[in-house]
UniProtKB/Swiss-Prot annotation:
Keyword annotations of the record: Disulfide bond, Ion channel impairing toxin, Knottin, Potassium channel impairing toxin, Secreted, Signal, Toxin, Voltage-gated potassium channel impairing toxin
Disulfide partners: 31-46, 38-51, 45-58
Lineage, uppermost ranks: Eukaryota, Metazoa, Ecdysozoa, Arthropoda, Chelicerata
GO MF annotation terms: ion channel inhibitor activity; potassium channel regulator activity; toxin activity
Organism listed in the record: Chilobrachys guangxiensis
Reported tissue expression: Expressed by the venom gland.
Protein name listed in UniProt: Kappa-theraphotoxin-Cg3a 1
Amino acid sequence: MKNTSILFILGLALLLVLAFEVQVGESDGECGGFWWKCGSGKPACCPKYVCSPKWGLCNFPMP
């Protein structure tokens, strides 16, 4: 009985952590991070990245 209670609490904690991560991931969809697919119909790259026309991925700007 004691082991079942511990497993239930750990499972519930894991479920809450995963639900939080999914929610955070959905709210970050405003701009694309490093190696994010960019281009027509896709979210724009975040301010510190540029969309590579050759690869169609967000990357660091070339100096």
